[in-house]
């Protein structure tokens, strides 16, 4: 069969498997996930060995340090993948939940019940842990899932998917409930995006070019997981030590991920003292700072920021920085340049914190906390499918509930419409 025919078959079989998944009891889904987690631990040496093939190929292709970090699996990261699956197993099952019930004047009882979306297609790059995270969330929420990972992680993804699919068979669940498209060519993505008859939604996770390609070519509704141009605004009332701890964590703990800090905004009233303070802290950790004119006035060694820097997701130890007139200017800057991912304010002023929360137009808005907490696990969702920067059908980190929709249920006692 051609690539197009094979992908159509994968999608059609996933559609059939989705009906079985939708009927699966919560206890059965939970046991499946627990067995999947154990299988990952038991087969960790094989996963790591396959991952080495991807890392070697990535080094030969000249992938950046950030990309290689996203790609790399070791024993601790495989354990983290298994732990994330276990966390999903422990979460309440949203399927079948009645979210409201009301009585009409004619005594009809009307309600809304959560149901699976059906078949979810996920297209992603670099991070092989997405394979297990996506499988766990989609299966727990009663969906079938069709995965298409990046060519740079093909060996890792195939190893993980094969291990997980084996557990489906052991539990008597159609193996097509979890499929990984094995074709690394772009044709595989193109054909997947044509399967509107079988796939209900596409969730792309990756770089700007991938997101744009999916949006422009998909016949299926898309929930975008765009880049993370994350901001922190240091207000005039901020505690300097708290601000330093948060900023250093947000920028340097793991710079190659989408919730790392990319732009720092500083209130003009504290610029004279705070800019040298934070410049010294970050430059000592090898962070390159690119500042506007006022920032460079107080940190002369900083590089000059250009217009492109305000839009940049660096994913490395580079940080854009600007001094702003106040809260209004900070909010305006964020709403202009943000990718709608995650923003944080460091402040001692409650009123300012509430204005920031209300007026900043992003999926996650924080007060006195690192942007690195913008993560499904950290926010109590369990493993996340990603962080949506699309307001429909979900916004921010997507957990189990975000992989369901609702249908109306109506109870009558013989009513007919007059």
Curated annotation (Swiss-Prot):
Pfam families: Aldedh. GO terms for biological process: L-proline biosynthetic process. It is found in: Cytoplasm. It catalyses: L-glutamate 5-semialdehyde + phosphate + NADP(+) = L-glutamyl 5-phosphate + NADPH + H(+). It comes from the Bacteria. Its main location: cytoplasm. Its EC number is 1.2.1.41. Keywords: Amino-acid biosynthesis, Cytoplasm, NADP, Oxidoreductase, Proline biosynthesis. GO terms for molecular function: glutamate-5-semialdehyde dehydrogenase activity; NADP binding. Pathway: Amino-acid biosynthesis; L-proline biosynthesis; L-glutamate 5-semialdehyde from L-glutamate: step 2/2. One of its GO terms (cellular component) is cytoplasm. The keyword Chloroplast does not apply. Catalyzes the NADPH-dependent reduction of L-glutamate 5-phosphate into L-glutamate 5-semialdehyde and phosphate. The product spontaneously undergoes cyclization to form 1-pyrroline-5-carboxylate. HAMAP family: ProA. Belongs to the gamma-glutamyl phosphate reductase family. This is Gamma-glutamyl phosphate reductase. It comes from Citrifermentans bemidjiense (strain ATCC BAA-1014 / DSM 16622 / JCM 12645 / Bem) (Geobacter bemidjiensis). The lineage of its organism: Bacteria, Pseudomonadati, Thermodesulfobacteriota, Desulfuromonadia, Geobacterales.
């Amino acid at each position: 069969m051609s690539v197009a025919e094979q992908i159509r078959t994968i999608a059609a079989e996933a559609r059939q498997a989705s009906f079985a998944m939708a009927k699966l009891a919560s206890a059965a889904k939970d046991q499946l996930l627990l067995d999947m987690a154990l299988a990952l631990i038991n087969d960790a040496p094989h996963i790591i060995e396959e991952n080495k093939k991807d890392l070697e190929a990535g080094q030969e292709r000249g992938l950046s340090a950030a990309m290689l970090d996203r790609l790399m699996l070791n024993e601790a990261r495989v354990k983290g993948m298994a732990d994330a699956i276990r966390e999903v197993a422990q979460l309440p099952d949203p399927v079948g939940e009645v979210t409201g019930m009301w009585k009409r004047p004619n005594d009809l009882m009307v309600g809304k019940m959560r149901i699976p979306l059906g078949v979810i297609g996920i297209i992603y790059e670099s991070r092989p842990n997405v394979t297990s995270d996506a499988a766990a969330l989609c299966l727990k929420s009663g969906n079938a899932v069709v995965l298409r990972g990046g060519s740079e992680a093909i060996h890792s993804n195939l190893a993980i998917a094969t291990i997980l699919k084996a557990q489906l068979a052991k539990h008597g669940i159609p193996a097509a409930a979890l499929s990984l498209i094995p074709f690394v060519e772009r044709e595989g993505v193109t054909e997947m995006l044509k399967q509107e008859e079988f796939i209900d939604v596409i969730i792309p996770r990756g770089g700007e070019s991938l997101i744009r390609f999916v949006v422009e070519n998909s016949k299926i509704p898309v929930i975008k997981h765009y880049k993370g141009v994350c901001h922190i605004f240091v207000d005039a009332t901020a505690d300097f030590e708290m601000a330093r701890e948060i900023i250093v964590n947000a920028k340097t703990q793991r710079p190659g991920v989408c919730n790392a800090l990319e732009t720092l905004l500083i209130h003009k009233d504290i610029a004279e003292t705070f800019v040298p303070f934070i410049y010294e802290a970050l430059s000592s950790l090898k962070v390159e700072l690119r500042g506007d004119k006022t920032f460079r006035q107080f940190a002369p060694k900083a590089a000059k920021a250009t217009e492109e820097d305000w839009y940049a997701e660096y994913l490395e130890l580079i940080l854009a920085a600007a001094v702003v007139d106040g809260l209004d200017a900070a909010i305006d800057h964020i709403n202009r340049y943000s990718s709608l991912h995650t923003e944080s304010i460091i402040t001692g002023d409650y009123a300012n914190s509430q204005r920031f929360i209300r007026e900043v137009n992003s999926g996650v808005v924080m007060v006195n906390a690192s942007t690195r907490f913008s993560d499904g696990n950290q926010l109590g969702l369990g493993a996340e499918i990603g962080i949506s920067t699309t307001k429909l059908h979900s916004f921010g980190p997507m957990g189990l509930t975000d992989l369901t929709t609702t249908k109306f249920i109506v109870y009558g006692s013989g009513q007919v419409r007059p």
